[in-house]
Amino acid sequence: MAFSGSQAPYLSPAVPFSGTIQGGLQDGFQITVNGAVLSSSGTRFAVDFQTGFSGNDIAFHFNPRFEDGGYVVCNTRQKGRWGPEERKMHMPFQKGMPFDLCFLVQSSDFKVMVNGSLFVQYFHRVPFHRVDTISVNGSVQLSYISFQNPRTVPVQPAFSTVPFSQPVCFPPRPRGRRQKPPSVRPANPAPITQTVIHTVQSASGQMFSQTPAIPPMMYPHPAYPMPFITTIPGGLYPSKSIILSGTVLPSAQRFHINLCSGSHIAFHMNPRFDENAVVRNTQINNSWGSEERSLPRKMPFVRGQSFSVWILCEAHCLKVAVDGQHVFEYYHRLRNLPTINKLEVGGDIQLTHVQT
């Protein structure tokens, strides 16, 4: 089955985890597994690229072991039988510490990056295009598993249902005429060009757009300088996603995520631990609009804990999920979406992954 776009991520999946890789693996495909090694007594974890869910046919078994000084086993399993092990006598992971693990599929091998550095190459023993499932088990906690297909090209809209390990439950839009949010700045929206759109099924049955035609930019650095500033390729448009993961500092007071259009801040998201609030706003010509603070539940960020933020752009608003749970919508006050092409992150956090 042809795969025409980047698959939506699995957010905060419980371990052990098995999930479908839509369309199977392809040359140039990139999978990022972001999480942390547990500091418990467990001594191993594994990431498996396999056919189906039985575990009898594993094209690539990546198995860090905190034993005998630490090493990583790579192997292949065919019809329930393991092949010869390949061992890397070096341990790039630490117990109790976060990691960013990236697998790049190439015609001859898997290339594995750990925290931004090439760790190992594993030459294919079976055809990689048979792989349609990723599994993770052992002594780890996951923030997300994301997918990138750099060969994405614009095609006629395709639709599919993407499973979430934790459903992102975005509320349905109210029927009838939508009320304008405060301080709406009128502007002419730019025409929407041909886009690959996949739909994601939420637990409550609503559908919302995901997977842009423009491949996302991914920055798999072990740590980011703060403040962190980068471009958003193509700007915002309906179905565009931005994903950030990191850890809140133990003594954090505030941090912010800004989506900018020139000198304007189209979207300002500002978790404030001193006020137990997540403030949202827009700044136009150095003048702030009215704040939005309402949340459906308690503050979604916790000092000293990791987090994953998913910002999904729709025609009328941004939908924001934290750790797989929808927390709010923010109606556009600057409506020329393609001009919103810069991401700024600052404050009391450590970033571990950014995808624009």
UniProtKB/Swiss-Prot annotation:
Keyword Signal: no
One matching Pfam family: Gal-bind_lectin
GO CC annotation: cytosol; nucleus
Binding site for a beta-D-galactoside 2: 288-294
CDD domains to which the protein is assigned, alphabetical: GLECT (cd00070)
Domain Galectin residues, every copy: 17-148, 228-356
Binding-site residues for a beta-D-galactoside 1, renumbered to this chain: 82-88
One GO MF term attached to the UniProt entry: galactoside binding
Gene3D superfamilies xref list: 2.60.120.200
Keyword Repeat: yes
Region (Disordered): 170-190
Cystines in this chain: none
Alphabetic keyword roster: Lectin, Repeat
GO biological process: negative regulation of CD4-positive, alpha-beta T cell proliferation; negative regulation of type II interferon production; positive regulation of gene expression
InterPro entries (UniProt xref): ConA-like_dom_sf, Galectin-like, Galectin_CRD
Domain of life: Eukaryota
Remarks, miscellaneous: The LGALS9-like proteins are encoded by a duplicated regions on chromosome 17; there are at least 3 genes coding for galectin-9-like proteins.
Role, per record: Binds galactosides.
Name of this chain's protein: Galectin-9B
Species, as recorded: Homo sapiens
Protein encoded by which gene: LGALS9B
